[in-house]
Each structure stands twice: as structure tokens, then as C-alpha cells.
């Protein structure tokens, strides 16, 4: 009796899953002590209009580049430290539009929350509002938190808050800056410094006047994104600069997607992967 050798299925290459299309907008701005000339309802509307313009353009890019990305809705993420004032107003508008929220805290949460109680607080029920925003995002599965390991020294903690601002910038494809134009009150690590860092990094910036009626770009700032059409074009430019055409996968990646034969024989690959990358697509997934 003769035995036929076992047959082996042909090697099958599985394409990697397509990434979601993603865009992230960060915020830096003033706390209530520098928003005394603001109309908060009007400022909220301005921020909401900017976010909606970004959202509309991302959806348009998703339609035009559908072959490159997963079939789900694009990921839209607001990046905010949730400090009192501008940060929270921005986050609330983003959540109302269905965006995800990434909260970048300059300290571990328990330490950061000390900014929102007692004499340190500048808003009524400040800690309650902070936690309420986090809870709203978490309950809908739209929250990421990045808690930095800043340690207060009892002196000037500007560098620690500045590190938080750099974290926001590093996780943002576009930055909205709400500034009052008063350079005399600017502090190290504050709004203006993060703005300069964004400019140096080539991140598109929308500069909104912290004073009513909240013009943008601010009258004191030449150039910049001057209208919603500019904002939408900046979104498209930022996204298209990160979309790579399909290219052969690295050899090291092939074993991860190759279906091996029953006896684990590593057959030569006869195809290349259809590999598409959008980078960066998501911030670190850190629990609240």
C-alpha cells in the first residue's frame, strides 16, 4: 500500500486591516482671569463653527479617499487639558458634535484636580465640571486620558504646565489658540509659547481673539487662517501630507500575516501586501 504525501494549501497573504481616517484638533487658551472681556456664549459658537468646518472637510476627504481607509466613520478627536475657561468650552463643543476627547493632564489626575478646588479655582463648581466632562466622554466610549508625571515643587510650576501644552501640540494635527494679545501677561509654558512651538513645528494654527466679538484671525496677527475655507484647506493639506500610497510591505512583516501550511513550512511569498499607512492616527490609549 502506498501513502500519498499530504497536500499543503497554497500560501495565502492577508492584507492588514485598513486604518481609520483620523484628525485631531488641540486647544490652548486662557483661564477665566484672562477671559473677562469674553462673551462665553459667542466664543462657544466660534469654537463650534471651527470644529464643524474641520469635521465637514474630514468627511469630504473620507469620501474622496475611501479606498485607503476602513469603512467606519472618521475618528475626530479634540485634545484638551480641560483647564478652566477655554479648554473646557472647547471640549464641550467637541463632545456635542460627537467628537472623541483626549485629555492631557500635566499631573496625575488627583494632583491636577487640586487646581479646581478652594482658592485655586476660578470657576464655581470647577471640580464638578471637570469630572462631568470626563464622565460624559467616558460613558460614550470616547475618552482617552494622558496623565503626565509632573511633580509640584512648591515654586513656579510653569514648566510643568508647559510640558502639558507640548503634549497637546504633539497630539494635534491643528491647533486652536484663544489669546488676548497681551504679551505682558504671557507666562513661560503658557498659551503664547505653545503657539510659537506650533508655528515652528509647522502645525496649522487658528488664532481666535479672547475678547468679544472673538475675531479670527486676531487683528494683531498677520496672515494665518483667515476664513473657514482656509481652515478646510489646511485640514486637507495636513491630512494629505500623511497619506502614503500603497507600497510593498517590509519583509519582516510578512510572517505576521502569512498563513503557514500544516507542517509550518515557510513557503516563499509570491505577492506583496497592499500596505497603506496614515500616521499618526491615534494618541496613546491610556485609562482615565
Language-model features: locations:
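Charged, amphipathic alpha-helical linkers/stalks
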Residues: 235-262
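Non-membrane alpha-helical secondary structure
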Residues: 39, 227, 245, 249-252, ...
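Acidic/glycine-enriched connector segments
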Residues: 2-244
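Basic, amphipathic N-terminal segments
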Residues: 253-288
Amino acid at each position: 500500500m502506498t501513502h500519498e504525501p499530504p497536500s499543503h494549501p497554497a500560501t495565502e497573504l492577508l492584507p492588514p486591516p485598513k486604518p481609520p481616517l483620523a484628525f485631531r484638533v488641540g486647544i490652548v487658551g486662557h483661564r477665566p482671569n484672562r477671559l473677562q472681556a469674553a462673551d462665553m456664549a459667542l466664543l462657544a459658537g466660534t469654537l463650534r463653527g471651527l470644529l464643524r468646518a474641520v469635521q465637514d472637510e474630514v468627511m469630504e476627504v473620507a469620501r474622496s479617499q475611501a479606498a485607503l481607509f476602513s469603512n467606519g466613520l472618521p475618528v475626530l478627536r479634540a485634545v484638551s487639558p480641560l483647564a478652566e475657561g477655554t479648554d473646557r468650552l472647547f471640549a464641550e463643543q467637541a463632545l456635542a458634535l460627537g467628537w472623541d476627547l483626549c485629555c492631557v493632564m500635566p499631573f496625575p489626575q488627583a494632583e491636577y484636580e487640586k487646581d479646581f478646588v478652594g482658592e485655586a479655582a476660578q470657576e464655581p463648581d470647577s471640580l464638578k465640571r471637570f469630572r462631568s466632562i470626563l464622565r460624559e466622554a467616558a460613558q460614550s466610549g470616547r475618552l482617552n486620558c494622558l496623565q503626565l508625571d509632573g511633580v509640584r515643587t512648591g515654586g513656579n510650576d510653569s514648566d510643568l504646565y508647559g510640558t502639558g501644552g507640548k503634549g497637546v501640540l504633539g497630539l494635534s494635527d491643528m491647533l486652536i489658540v484663544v489669546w488676548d494679545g497681551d504679551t505682558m501677561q504671557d507666562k513661560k509654558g503658557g498659551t503664547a509659547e505653545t503657539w510659537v512651538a506650533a508655528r515652528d513645528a509647522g502645525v496649522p494654527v487658528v488664532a481666535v481673539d479672547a475678547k468679544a466679538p472673538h475675531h479670527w484671525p486676531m487683528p494683531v496677527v498677520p496672515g494665518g487662517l483667515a476664513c473657514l475655507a482656509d481652515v478646510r484647506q489646511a485640514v486637507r493639506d495636513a491630512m494629505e501630507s500623511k497619506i502614503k500610497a500603497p507600497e510593498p510591505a517590509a519583509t519582516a512583516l510578512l510572517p505576521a500575516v502569512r498563513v503557514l501550511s500544516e507542517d509550518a513550512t515557510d513557503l516563499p511569498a509570491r505577492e506583496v501586501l497592499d500596505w497603506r499607512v496614515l500616521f499618526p492616527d491615534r494618541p496613546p490609549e491610556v485609562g482615565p
